[in-house]
Amino acid sequence: MEEKHYEKTRDRRSDAGFFRCAAIVIPYLNPAELAAISCTSKSLYQISKTITSRRTSDASRGSENLPIPFLNPISDDSQPYSYFFYTPTQTLRLRPDFRQAWGSNDQSRLCRKEGRPDPFLLRVEGASGCECASCNGDCCPCLEADEFLLTRECGPSCKCGLGCGNRVTQGGVTVRLKMVKDEKKGWGLYAAEFIPRGQFVCEYAGELLSTKEATRRQQTYDKLASITPALLVVKEHLPSGNKCMRINIDATRIGNIARFVNHSCDGGNLDTVIVRSSGALLPRICFFASRDIQENEELTFSYGDIRLRPNGQPCFCGTATCAGILPSENT
């Protein structure tokens, strides 16, 4: 009897150890790997199902202020969510073997504990900033906006903190959003509440690339019809007028919910704004509402001028000005 009791106790401990390990390892699996292990046992099937449900409930993995769920109304579609690595801010190039947990039980708690990542990838040593305690008025020297859709905010060289009124883009998403799948366009980002004109929506986050690397990747993406790229190129014209700074952000593999914003040939309802912060070396690309946006309305912007290509991807924006083909960066 004692021997049988010992064996049962040992088996229970073994099972408990297995499930603890599974809870740690399985969130790192991609959808194909998750589907494969779910077929091996009832227990792993339930674990995989739970992880899928958590992934569907929040694309941001708890990194944003509000959950951003996936909603798939296509009944015969087997993909309840889109798999990608998440970063709420700019990041450097990833290692090829990079993995990221998604769907663990305590992921949201860990994100809150660790806090939001520093939005400034590189800083300017010795840069001067404002001395304001909280820049809620128009007197802050950092506060500036112009007709070229360039905004200046307080940054790492300023005395104020994240609660400053001139740091609206640095605290993450503050409006309710959702991902909805369309039969033609695939996943798109939608407003889950009314968004007033001028409201900050989200940053365009992803890998910050050199122009050489961005050109190489774009040429690769052009050849691979199976990949839907999310490489954004924005050119900031310098005061001289005859030169420009090119900003290349690739959210194809790692990015945030901005990677799901689809193109609209009529310009869409979002403005692409270059945001510079005092003491930060590099600007950030952010989306602001260009007009009032209604609840359940899709968020869109213009990818740029149409470049006619024989193998160009079709456009399904459905606007009266639709050109029938998506813009593509001229490399």
Task: Give the location of each predicted region.
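Intrinsically disordered, low-complexity regions enriched in proline, serine, glycine
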Residues: 34-38, 47-49, 53-57, 140-144, ...
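Eukaryotic intrinsically disordered and solvent-exposed regulatory patches
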Residues: 9-12, 30-32, 115-119, 138-142, ...
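Skp1-binding F-box subdomain of Cullin-RING ligase substrate receptors
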Residues: 1-118
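Generic structural signal for buried aliphatic residues
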Residues: 195-201, 293-300
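Cys/His-rich Zn2+-coordinating "finger/knuckle" modules used by eukaryotic regulatory proteins
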Residues: 113-173, 299-300, 305-307, 312-331
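Catalytic cores of histone-lysine modification enzymes
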Residues: 167-276, 281
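Amphipathic alpha-helical protein-protein interaction segments
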Residues: 7-18, 27-37, 125, 147, ...
